[in-house]
């Protein structure tokens, strides 16, 4: 039975055994060297995660791509503390154009909200990653093609437009309960 995106992702995180975790959704595709670039950048900078730009991709009526440039060249190639600027909290979550150190996710209890039938479940995951990371590295290269013409995609369902509210409620709960508790001595 399909228990939903968040629950499925959490099962994947529980089963993961490698140093890094990457996410690829079924209707998208990665550049052949995407994981090599992301892991190399994360490893060489001892980063909690490495994240890159991506392309919007259409296959109909003809194939075309458009770079979604979240990170400008000046922001790339050097380690940053992602929560030092609000810029990164405002970006499209795009959790699939990144790799995350598995021990970082586990240490911070970062998982997905397991709400069956929901959408936007990458929203709270991405927020928690940015808030908890001590070091990130951004790449200018587009490493993933994010398909825009899948009519069955949950982001194209008007019935699911309010699901993002559940994600924002989870962010608020997490800040109040988990983040505040775990970072009380950071002042």
Model-derived segments and spans:
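C-terminal, non-catalytic tails of nucleotide-sugar-dependent glycosyltransferases
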Residues: 166-187
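Donor-binding/catalytic cores of nucleotide-activated saccharide
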Residues: 5, 9, 26-140, 144-161
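Short aromatic/hydrophobic "clamp" motif used to bind/position activated sugar donors
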Residues: 21
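Glycine-rich, basic loop-to-helix element that forms the pyrophosphate-binding segment
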Residues: 1-16
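Tetratricopeptide repeat
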Residues: 16, 38, 168-171
């Amino acid at each position: 039975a399909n228990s939903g995106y968040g629950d499925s992702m959490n099962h994947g995180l529980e089963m993961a055994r490698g140093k890094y975790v990457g996410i690829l959704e079924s209707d998208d595709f990665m550049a052949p060297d995407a994981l090599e670039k992301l892991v190399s950048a994360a490893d060489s900078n001892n980063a909690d995660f490495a994240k890159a730009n991506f392309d919007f991709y259409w296959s109909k009526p003809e194939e075309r791509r458009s770079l979604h440039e979240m990170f400008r060249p000046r922001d790339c190639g050097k380690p940053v503390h992602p929560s030092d600027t609000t810029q990164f909290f405002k970006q499209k979550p795009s959790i699939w154009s990144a790799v995350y150190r598995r021990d970082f996710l586990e240490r911070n209890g970062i998982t997905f909200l397991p709400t069956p039938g929901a959408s936007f479940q990458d929203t709270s995951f991405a927020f928690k990653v940015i808030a908890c990371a001590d070091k990130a590295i951004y790449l200018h290269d587009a490493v993933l093609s994010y398909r825009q013409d899948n009519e069955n995609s949950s982001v194209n369902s008007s019935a699911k437009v309010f699901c993002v509210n559940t994600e924002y409620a989870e962010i608020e709960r997490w800040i109040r309960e988990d983040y505040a508790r775990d970072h009380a001595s950071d002042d």
